[in-house]
Amino acid sequence: EHIKGPGKGSTRGPAGCTIMCTPLLEAQEKLAHGITFYNPSQQRRYHLASAMFVDDNSTYTNKFLRWLNCAVDHTEVIEHLRHDAQVWERLLWTSGGLLKLQKCLYYVVHWQFDLEGRATLTPSSELLPHIQLSSGNSGNYNTISQYDCHLAHRTLGAWLSPSLCMKEALRRLTIIANLFARRIVTSSLTRWEAWMAYFSVFFLQMKYTFPISHHSSTSLRRLQSPAVRATLVKIGFSRNTPLAVIYGPIDFGGIAFRDLAVEQGIEQLCMIIR
């Protein structure tokens, strides 16, 4: 019979995961190159080999001080990253786990500067060789997918890329917002239920990634328009109600809907304070 873990939904799952993963992460800190940062005076140092959330793990690598003062060979970056990833695979394997290499990917953030000093990210097609990792005791090597720095990847629900481009994230939010609007229009919800759906479903879906997003105000107001107009009709208002009334406080005769452009700023500020 196969030995199975406690499962993600069990009450003992978090404790079991902590007991298993803590020594693995401590070993990763000692064996991997990791990533290091310093403050401008170089009096404070921060080092991290990997960041983990449940069963999702991200590893990072750099040689901060040395690469500040000399040209960086991207092949060295790739080799350090390959080494750190293989270390994590070995740790998982020896502890009874398995890294699913088909789901792994990596970015190489390598800057190029023109004669005017303008920086651009090197395309992934120029960043060779590709990383290959072994899995378990099979002796076989798998090529890991390399993503271009402008290509977003979903991380814990947020679509992010090293270039900080938000096009894919906005596109995904637009799909969710338009789907909500269609469902509200075609539903048989009461006014109270439509009101609750706006705040408990749509609003929470939209603001989840706001602490780490930087969408323009114009984009966010265009994004929220279909859902807001559909909800207004369901709760008995005109879809062309003035914005001052839609987003105004109830104490002053407003409907108290939330402007996503304002909420993004609030969420970012709260994250900084925390």
Question: PLM features: residue spans?
Answer:
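Conserved pre-motif C helix in the palm subdomain of viral-like polymerases
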Residues: H2-F37, H80-L81, C165, W192-M196, ...
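Mobile genetic element proteins and their domesticated derivatives, centered on retroelements
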Residues: G9, C21-L24, D55, L92, ...
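A glycine-rich phosphate-binding loop feature that marks nucleotide/adenosyl-phosphate handling sites
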Residues: Q42-Q43, L101-Q112, L220-V228, P242-D251
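Basic, alpha-helical interaction scaffolds
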Residues: L133-S217, I235, I266-R274
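Extended C-terminal regions of large enzymes
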Residues: L223, G236-R274
